Curated annotation (Swiss-Prot):
Location, primary (coarse class): cytoplasm
Name of the protein: Tyrosine recombinase XerC
Alphabetic keyword roster: Cell cycle, Cell division, Chromosome partition, Cytoplasm, DNA integration, DNA recombination, DNA-binding
Chain ranges of the Core-binding (CB) domain: 1-94
Role description: Site-specific tyrosine recombinase, which acts by catalyzing the cutting and rejoining of the recombining DNA molecules. The XerC-XerD complex is essential to convert dimers of the bacterial chromosome into monomers to permit their segregation at cell division. It also contributes to the segregational stability of plasmids.
Source superkingdom: Bacteria
Family annotation (PROSITE patterns): CB, TYR_RECOMBINASE
Gene name tied to this protein: xerC
Coiled-coil positions: none
Residues annotated as the enzyme's active site: R154, K178, H244, R247, H270, Y279 (o-(3'-phospho-dna)-tyrosine intermediate)
Length: 305
């Protein structure tokens, strides 16, 4: 078993990371292994300057790898993810005494331009969640959308929800987030009403998934993505609506109303407030639009144009 395979086994068995996280590590480290295997002489022999075993790499080898991935057209964000996986891998090797220093510790990928998350305005969000409940699966769709927008869950968190995680009388949901961290999140009154209706209709037990898939178990993330796109079209929305737009909209609208960045951080389950601060830029965009529409000098400037 290679060092990379051992590390992946450690992540799965000891760290018990999610399947999604494990797949991401596997893809990123597979790219490193493939690059190493491609470093051959004209005779097809492994280049003596590049070890076939990634555990023997130094920082120069990793810089060559990152440069090769960059030439291949990988985005700055993807390069950052590749390096993050490498740092975790080499930190694991270091902790186990396999290497004396991590070759990835000092390496930095190019900074990715920070894109602002796409959001729906309040009217658009309401139009999306108020899908007809008399259509096939209408009660489920309404409950799913209401919970998504009401509580700002991640897509993976929404799909994993079980009825036992919900306390509809108290209006709270216990969410198992990234890193197996639990957090309590409020559930709005419209979402509670939709969930009660959906549970009465489905007759589900406490251990059942709130939103089951066709084959049993939890609904897949892909199924939710497709369904939300379909529902957005049915509701006459012309934006390319994707699930995380509801989470982003939740965060943006809460921050816009309250100005409480720390509170939004806790609701979203962000470990680093810097991740939450992206929504302050959205709030500033909104304020800038209000200014342009309302400030007398802004209006005069617009009229002059």
């Amino acid at each position: 078993m290679s060092s990379v395979d051992e590390f992946l086994t450690y992540l799965q068995v000891e760290r018990q990371v999610s399947a999604h996280t494990l797949d991401a590590y596997r893809r990123d480290l597979a790219a490193l292994v493939v690059w190493a295997s491609e470093q051959k002489t004209d005779d097809g022999v492994q280049d003596a300057a590049v070890p076939a075993e990634t555990a023997q790499f130094d920082s120069a080898h990793l810089r060559q790898f990152v440069a090769a991935e960059h030439r291949r057209g990988l985005s700055a964000k993807s390069l950052q993810r590749r390096l993050s996986a490498c740092r975790s891998y080499y930190a694991w090797l270091l902790k186990r005494g396999r290497i004396s220093a991590s070759p990835a510790a000092a390496l930095r990928a190019p900074k990715a331009p920070r894109k602002l998350p796409q959001v729906l305005d309040a009217d658009e969000a309401v139009r999306l969640v108020e899908v007809p409940t008399d259509a096939p699966l209408g009660l489920r769709d309404r409950a799913l959308l209401e919970v998504f927008y009401s509580s700002g869950l991640r897509l993976s968190e929404l799909c994993a929800l079980r009825w036992r995680d919900l306390d509809l009388d108290s209006g709270l949901v216990m969410v198992l987030g990234k890193g197996s961290k639990q957090r309590l999140v409020p559930v709005g009154s419209h979402a509670i009403a939709a969930l009660r209706e959906w549970r009465r209709d489905s007759g589900a037990s406490a251990d059942s998934h709130v939103f089951p898939g066709r084959a049993g178990g939890a609904i897949s993330q892909r199924a939710v993505q497709i369904r939300i796109k379909q529902l957005a079209v049915r509701q006459g929305m012309f934006k390319d609506v994707h699930p995380h737009m509801l989470r982003h909209s939740f965060a943006s609208h809460i921050l816009e109303s309250s100005g409480d960045l720390r509170g939004v951080q806790e609701l979203l389950g962000h470990s680093d407030i810097a991740t939450t601060q992206i929504y302050t830029h959205l709030d500033f965009q909104h304020l800038a639009k209000v200014y342009d529409a309302a400030h007398p000098r802004a209006r005069r400037k617009k009229a002059a144009e």
